[in-house]
């Protein structure tokens, strides 16, 4: 059976379903093809379930430290089965919400594996979508005027470190653990690795992180990376940076797993009950029919222009499958850009320097714009405003006074180039910095904005004032 659509979206993750909703809002007949569950990696294997686990870890840690607040507790224990049940309940509730939005928008959802066909009896152009349901039924044929590829990504693997789902895991398998290990080696000290390190430590797991770069969080501002490593080391997490894991040395027993890492010419063996491989993500471009089109790929990702168009002008691609900043909110924004572009609304292209990035560890970190080193490399005459949370009353009230807010600005133009934060609840504060950049606010203007007292947001205002040497409380 063949059905015509204005747009068919291949992939029902965050980028795909948001694109579908926007298309439906514009009156376009829309379909989504999803091989698993609507919501994709973010809802089922990433953002949401991991943050639910992080929240449980935070509550567990707070309960153990309750005496610091004058609250005496005895026999605090962790029921990891209930932790997982709560996580799944959160996921299920949000998944039901996404399904409701599809019905509300009268968006057709096809559950199956979608593949792009070349020119055929259905269309002289490549882009007809064949949907294989996998149950012996005849494939559905969808004939769209426009196609959006939103097939997402999966954990990248290190050759030789094959995942077995038991002792060697990716974040996908780790989210489904029924029991916590006593110890774990995390290969990779990027955002995902650090979130897992923080979470598992708060759950009481002994954590060792091995990172190839010379510092953890190598894409973040240098001061943020150093502060994060320092604070997590104080908690008891072990970091080995500038080290190359040697996959061929991995050995397993019934009790643990061992692997060697080379650092400064020396080889050291590390052992733990489990290993988590967290070295980035790989775009899902295989098996979707790209060979039937003129779409260009580079380094395993689909190449697009600023409007998310591929070389086939009627086929767009968004989200992790095109690389760049592999973040759910970026995929959503790109989905809207793609839809509005083929609808003739001339949307603004995405500016990577306006995208907030968040790390949900303890402490949290967040940033938007250029790092100090990037700003200097781009030729800016840089000035810095920095303010510590230890001088913020609300942070002391919370008992979370580590960290700081750092503003990178141009001394000549007074433009805010980047804002970087590490400390309590900064992932909920970074949007102010993003808005300041969108509105081309100067540090002085942010500093003149009245920030209520006592709040953590005062640190932003004070850091802005500090850029001109005018901070009040430090």
Curated annotation (Swiss-Prot):
Gene3D superfamilies: 3.30.390.30, FAD/NAD(P)-binding domain (3.50.50.60). It comes from the Bacteria. Coiled coil: none annotated. The active site is at residue 453. FAD binds at residues 34-42, 51, 114, 320, 328. GO terms for cellular component: cytoplasm. Its cofactor is FAD. One of its GO terms (molecular function) is dihydrolipoyl dehydrogenase (NADH) activity. The active site is a redox-active disulfide bond. Belongs to the class-I pyridine nucleotide-disulfide oxidoreductase family. This is Dihydrolipoyl dehydrogenase.
């Amino acid at each position: 059976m063949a059905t015509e659509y204005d747009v068919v979206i291949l992939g029902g993750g965050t980028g795909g379903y948001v694109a579908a909703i926007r298309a439906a809002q514009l009156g376009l007949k829309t379909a989504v093809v999803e091989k698993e569950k609507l919501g994709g990696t973010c809802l089922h294997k990433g953002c949401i379930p991991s943050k639910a686990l992080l929240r449980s870890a935070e509550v567990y840690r707070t309960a153990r430290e309750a005496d610091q607040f004058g609250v005496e507790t005895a026999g605090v224990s962790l029921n990891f089965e209930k932790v997982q049940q709560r996580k799944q309940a959160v996921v299920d509730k949000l998944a039901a919400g996404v399904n409701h939005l599809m019905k509300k928008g009268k968006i057709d959802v096809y559950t199956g594996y979608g593949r792009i066909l070349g020119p055929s009896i259905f269309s002289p152009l490549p882009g007809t979508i064949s949907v294989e349901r996998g149950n012996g039924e005849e494939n559905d044929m969808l004939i769209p005027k426009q196609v959006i590829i939103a097939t997402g990504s999966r954990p990248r693997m290190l050759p030789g470190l094959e995942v077995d789902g038991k002792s060697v895991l990716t974040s996908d398998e780790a989210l489904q653990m029924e029991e916590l290990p006593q110890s774990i080696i995390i290969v990779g000290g990027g955002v995902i690795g650090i979130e897992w390190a923080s979470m598992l430590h708060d759950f009481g797991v002994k954590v060792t992180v091995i990172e190839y770069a010379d510092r953890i969080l190598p894409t973040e501002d240098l001061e943020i990376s150093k502060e994060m490593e320092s604070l997590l080391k104080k908690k008891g997490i072990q970091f080995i940076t500038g080290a190359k894991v040697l996959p061929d040395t991995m050995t397993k027993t019934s009790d643990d797993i061992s692997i060697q890492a080379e650092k400064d010419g020396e080889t050291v063996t590390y052992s733990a009950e489990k290993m988590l491989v967290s070295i980035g993500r790989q775009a899902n471009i295989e098996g979707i029919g790209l060979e039937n089109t003129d779409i260009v790929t580079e380094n395993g990702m689909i190449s697009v222009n600023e409007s998310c168009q591929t070389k086939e002008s009627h086929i767009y691609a968004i989200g992790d499958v095109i690389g760049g900043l592999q973040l759910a909110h970026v995929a959503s924004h790109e989905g809207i850009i793609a839809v509005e572009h083929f609808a003739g609304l001339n949307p603004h292209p995405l500016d990577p320097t306006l995208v907030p990035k968040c790390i949900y560890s303890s402490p949290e970190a967040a940033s938007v714009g250029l790092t100090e080193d990037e700003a200097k490399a781009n030729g800016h005459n840089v000035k810095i405003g920095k303010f510590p949370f230890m001088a913020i009353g609300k942070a002391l009230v919370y008992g979370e006074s580590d960290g700081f807010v750092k503003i990178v600005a141009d001394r000549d133009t007074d433009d805010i180039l980047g804002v970087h934060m590490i400390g309590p609840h900064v992932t909920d504060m970074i949007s102010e910095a993003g808005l300041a950049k969108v509105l081309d606010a100067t540090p002085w203007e942010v500093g003149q904005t009245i920030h209520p007292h006592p709040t953590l947001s005062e640190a932003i205002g004070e850091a802005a004032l500090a850029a001109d040497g005018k901070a009040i409380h430090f």
